[in-house]
């Protein structure tokens, strides 16, 4: 997936970007279910037992189990055939960790984006909050909302780009057809990503889960193109 990093502080050198992109390469090689030699693929083939999981894999499994409990089973990295796919959590987790790399180097004004999910810090080159567009799932050329971000993260789950890749673990056989996209703003992109995935799996009820969850705001577009937003979402809207 495309990855974008922008830093507007002084003292930026190519090595800082290299470090971030190297980290994403590491994550991809470890967690990609499309790579036969990744750790997660070896786990799915039962070539690696839990006791021998790497520290990062153990952390991701722990966070996934925690998210499953919080969402009452709507987030589950284990499919019905027993295979594990932690991608619904790993992307946001990796973006958040990449942002921490830049923070440790002393950077204040930057954003990190991967596959449409974003962690933003500080201000953009105009001294304003970072501007993020939410696409219309019925017309991807159209931006239907512009959000201002600073020190928080945003993630969108949906079926309008990749098709039906998210399922309701409580009703696996039926596709999620009543909504097309659900965008979540959280204190960081990791929080936004994992709960966007879980909320989308809930269908139309997902926006109410986001409404009631502390620290999250959401924006849902249903199959008819009708949007529903949480109470505080408007506080993040620029246009």
Model regions and ranges:
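Mature catalytic core of soluble alpha/beta enzymes
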Residues: 1-239
């Amino acid at each position: 997936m495309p990855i974008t990093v922008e830093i507007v502080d002084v003292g930026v050198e190519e090595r800082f970007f290299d470090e971030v992109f190297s980290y994403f390469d590491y994550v991809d090689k470890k967690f990609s279910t499309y790579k036969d030699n990744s750790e997660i693929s070896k786990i799915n083939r039962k070539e690696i037992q839990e006791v021998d999981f790497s520290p990062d894999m153990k952390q991701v499994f722990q966070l996934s189990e925690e998210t499953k409990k919080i969402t009452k089973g709507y987030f589950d990295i284990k499919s019905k055939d027993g295979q594990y796919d932690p991608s619904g959590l790993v992307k946001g987790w990796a973006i958040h960790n990449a942002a921490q790399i830049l923070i440790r180097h002393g950077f204040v004004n930057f954003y990190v984006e991967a596959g449409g999910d974003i962690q933003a810090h500080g201000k953009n080159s105009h001294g304003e909050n970072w501007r993020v567009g939410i696409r219309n799932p019925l017309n991807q050329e159209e931006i239907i909302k512009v959000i201002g971000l600073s020190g928080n993260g945003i993630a969108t789950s949906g079926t309008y780009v990749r098709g039906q890749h998210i399922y309701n673990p409580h009703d696996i056989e039926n596709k999620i057809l009543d909504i097309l996209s659900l965008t979540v703003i959280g204190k960081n992109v990791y929080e936004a990503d994992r709960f966007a995935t879980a909320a989308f799996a809930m269908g139309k009820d997902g926006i109410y889960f986001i409404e009631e969850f502390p620290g999250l705001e959401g924006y849902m577009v249903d199959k008819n193109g009708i949007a529903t937003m949480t109470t505080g979402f408007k506080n993040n809207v620029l246009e």
